[in-house]
């Protein structure tokens, strides 16, 4: 374990003493440091009628227990304080450590003893994470140190778990959206699942916009999947044009229906544990699946601003600008009289994507988004540089396949009976519009590109993204983060994992940082919290996070690739082609070992190479035919210890998100020896070699200059490392699988790897 503490708010002595007193700690500035520490320790053992007993189980020195120490005349020293602090945080002498000083250095322990600062040290200790993954104060509150009185209690600028999660209100309302996506002449109704604590005060809201939450149709999804085996189409030379079109919602009228009290209820919905954490701290949770999902009406428009509007309508309702009904019969309306109108959206992948889309509408009431692994351009999710390009791990998926997965109205047999025929017509229109044949950008994709509206974002923004996420690739967050207005507060966590949540990792206090931010933005707490704009997980060692100023630098280093002419054959033998088609992982293994159809260049680094941004391959290339697909991957190659990309559970249920509520495991990325690490990758239809909007012809056997931008990253390579460049055609995981008989030739003498270099 190593501390990377970004959530602690430095506090004055007076404020620290005041907050400790509010928690019931009997500390006094006139007492000695030793007396105050003893008083603190006895208080945290509140379960024991006799606190001598638990004190006797701690050691103050290697030869003295804590009870004996406090009964002695010995002075409090750094040695004693450190040893007791470690034990209070759950670290066991002789098990977790033998030498306290060395262990504290390894932990990067954030508290440095000064006898005159004991009150501040105790305050800081309470806000520091235990071995279990919870801060000490959260751990104590979870054990019942504070009663669940359904009111706010704050410590170090963060809300504590004092809302009773055993008496939650669970209710359903149906919000009227200014849409008619299924063309039935009726406004679409949007089902909203609300979970809120009982409270006399208006509550802020965490909203998870999740098209998955009302169920998914995996059978329809699997039937809709496309075969990837097809020839790469030769496209006509042309220029693509699109237009920016404002989404115009329908006009609704004020509702004059009576207020209803008898709301639909529910017992369970698959919740997001970060939401649960805030539910216990006085934040209502709502889950919304939007148009075309079970319990709602409308068509699943998948990624456009009509779908976004169905979520926006819910924020409007929370602020009194839209109508919600108690049921589909629409006999009574219901108002969000429990809400303070301020909303933060949460969630990963499609959920975070909807958060980004919502933010670009500039809707009033949306104070903040926490968007993890989020898409900012749907074209870049299902296409790349003029190619059909599947997200990592999902060959054959496309946006209409996702529509089938999430159109959960068809999971309700009655809805299927009444609406499926019309749904199939609308789905067919969507399938035609996305143009899987060419892979080109068009108006359909432009209408699902949130980047063009990034200037309209006015809420605070928090993004997290994995630099090993080949599902929602790093370009998605790179482009939206760098497009955000300079006038807003923005934050980015870049981790070394894949497509995963990071709120329950051991090495980073993400959850507590979000608590401080949300108390600022949604509760109006003046806590003086300041979070760095960008925090990056160091890839060279375990559990080390660093502040960064930018994602993407203009300083470059050009690396020569060699002097040879390299030939890349596209065609595989029939058996090999079929085998790779059945198991794309086998093709990846062969590729990384140099056993596939590829050109391979190894570069031994003579100095450190700190990459920050978008690596570009500038290549001199020719094709034997009038078509060509170019794929590339950059590897950190050779055996050494690296971070894994999938977090593993260190404990099973040590994190309590309330008071014995929604427990979850503590996780972390492992650090272990392996043979390589993918740094970046990229794909291109050579007919789109100049830009996305220009389709060019490919002259047979004529040299072309190609600039292939790879996925942006921040990655540190060290002197002596090997950087491996792999050039090839078909990627069996991502691209179409064209097995026609053509070849690419690369002139390495006129090719370079252009690397953006991080400044010191």
From Swiss-Prot:
Name of one Pfam family that matches: PepX_N
Enzyme Commission number(s): 3.4.14.11
One GO term describing the cellular component: cytoplasm
Keywords associated with the record: Aminopeptidase, Cytoplasm, Hydrolase, Protease, Serine protease
Keyword Transmembrane helix: no
SMART domains, per the entry: PepX_C (SM00939), PepX_N (SM00940)
Record-linked InterPro entries: AB_hydrolase_fold (IPR029058), Galactose-bd-like_sf (IPR008979), Pept_S15_Xpro (IPR008252), PepX_N_dom (IPR015251), PepX_N_dom_sf (IPR036313), Xaa-Pro-like_dom (IPR000383), Xaa-Pro_dipept_C (IPR013736), Xaa-Pro_dipeptidyl-ppase/CocE (IPR050585)
GO molecular function per UniProt: aminopeptidase activity; dipeptidyl-peptidase activity; serine-type peptidase activity
Record-annotated active site: 349 (charge relay system), 469 (charge relay system), 499 (charge relay system)
GO biological process, one term: proteolysis
Location of the protein in the cell: Cytoplasm
Record function comment: Removes N-terminal dipeptides sequentially from polypeptides having unsubstituted N-termini provided that the penultimate residue is proline.
Record-linked HAMAP family: Aminopeptidase_S15
Family: Belongs to the peptidase S15 family.
Name this polypeptide is given: Xaa-Pro dipeptidyl-peptidase
Organism this protein belongs to: Streptococcus pyogenes serotype M28 (strain MGAS6180)
Gene for this chain: pepX
């Amino acid at each position: 374990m190593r501390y990377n503490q970004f959530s602690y708010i430095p506090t004055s002595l007076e404020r620290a003493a005041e907050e400790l007193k509010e928690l019931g700690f009997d500390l006094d500035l006139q007492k000695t440091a030793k007396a105050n520490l003893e008083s603190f320790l006895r208080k945290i053992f509140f379960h024991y009628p006799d606190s001598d007993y638990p004190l006797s189980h701690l050691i103050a020195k290697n030869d003295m227990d804590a009870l004996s120490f406090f009964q002695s005349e010995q002075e409090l020293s750094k040695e004693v304080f450190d040893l007791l602090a470690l034990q209070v945080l759950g670290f066991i002498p002789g098990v977790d450590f033998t030498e306290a000083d060395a262990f504290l250095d390894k932990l990067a322990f954030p508290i440095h003893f000064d006898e005159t600062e004991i009150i501040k040290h105790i305050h800081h200790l309470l806000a520091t994470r235990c071995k279990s993954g919870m801060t000490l104060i959260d751990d104590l509150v979870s054990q019942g140190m504070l009663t669940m009185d359904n009111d706010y209690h704050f410590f170090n600028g963060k809300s504590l778990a004092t809302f009773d999660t055993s008496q939650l209100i669970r209710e359903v309302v149906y919000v009227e959206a200014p849409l008619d996506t299924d063309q039935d002449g009726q406004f679409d109704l949007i089902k909203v699942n609300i979970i809120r604590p009982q409270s006399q005060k208006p509550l802020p809201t965490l909203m998870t916009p999740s098209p998955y939450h009302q169920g998914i149709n995996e059978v329809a999804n699997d039937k809709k999947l496309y075969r990837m085996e097809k020839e790469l189409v030769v496209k006509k030379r042309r220029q693509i044009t699109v237009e920016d079109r404002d989404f115009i919602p329908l006009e609704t009228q004020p509702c004059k229906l009576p207020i209803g009290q008898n709301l639909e209820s529910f017992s369970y919905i698959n919740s997001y544990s970060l939401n649960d954490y805030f539910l216990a701290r006085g934040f209502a949770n709502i889950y919304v699946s939007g148009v075309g999902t079970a319990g709602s009406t409308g068509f699943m428009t998948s990624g456009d601003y009509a779908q976004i509007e169905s979520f926006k309508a819910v924020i409007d309702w929370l602020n009194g600008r839209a109508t919600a009904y108690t049921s589909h019969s629409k006999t009574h309306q219901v108002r969000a009289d429990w809400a303070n109108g301020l909303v933060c959206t949460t969630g990963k992948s499609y959920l975070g994507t909807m958060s980004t889309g919502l933010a670009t509408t500039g809707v009033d009431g949306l104070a903040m988004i926490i968007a993890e692994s989020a898409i900012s351009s749907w074209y870049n999710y299902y296409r790349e540089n003029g190619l059909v390009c599947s997200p990592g791990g999902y060959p054959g998926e496309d946006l209409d396949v996702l529509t089938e997965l999430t159109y959960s109205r068809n999971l309700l047999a009655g809805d299927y009976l009444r609406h499926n025929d019309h749904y199939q017509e609308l789905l067919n229109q969507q399938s035609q519009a996305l143009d899987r044949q060419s892979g080109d950008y068009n108006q359909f994709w432009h209408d699902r590109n949130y980047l063009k509206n990034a200037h309209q974002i006015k809420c605070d923004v928090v993004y997290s993204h994995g630099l090993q996420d080949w599902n929602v690739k790093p370009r998605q967050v790179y482009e939206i983060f760098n497009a955000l207005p300079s006038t807003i507060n923005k934050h980015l966590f870049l981790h070394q994992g894949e497509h995963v949540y990071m709120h329950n990792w051991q090495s980073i206090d993400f959850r507590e940082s979000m608590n401080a931010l949300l108390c600022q933005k949604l509760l109006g707490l003046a806590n003086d919290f300041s979070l760095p704009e960008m925090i990056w997980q160091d890839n060279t060692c375990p559990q080390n996070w660093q502040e960064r100023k930018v994602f993407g630098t203009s300083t470059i280093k050009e690396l020569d690739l060699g002097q040879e002419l390299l030939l890349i054959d596209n065609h595989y033998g029939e058996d090999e082609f079929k085998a790779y088609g059945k198991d794309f992982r086998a093709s990846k293994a062969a590729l990384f070992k140099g056993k596939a159809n590829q050109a391979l260049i190894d570069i031994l680094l003579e100095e450190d190479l700190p990459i920050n941004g978008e690596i570009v391959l500038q290549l001199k290339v020719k094709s034997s035919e009038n078509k060509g697909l170019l794929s590339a991957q950059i590897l950190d190659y050779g055996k050494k210890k690296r971070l894994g990309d999938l977090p593993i559970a260190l404990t099973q249920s040590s994190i309590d998100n309330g008071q014995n509520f929604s427990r979850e495991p503590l996780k972390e990325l492992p650090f272990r020896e392996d043979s390589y690490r993918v740094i970046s990758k990229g794909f291109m239809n050579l007919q789109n070699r100049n830009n996305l909007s220009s389709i060019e012809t490919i002259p047979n056997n004529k040299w072309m200059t190609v600039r292939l931008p790879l996925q942006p990253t921040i990655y540190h390579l060290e002197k002596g490392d090997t950087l491996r460049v792999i050039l090839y055609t078909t990627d069996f995981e991502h691209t179409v699988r064209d097995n026609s008989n053509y070849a690419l030739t690369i002139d390495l003498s006129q090719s370079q790897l252009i690397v953006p270099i991080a400044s010191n």
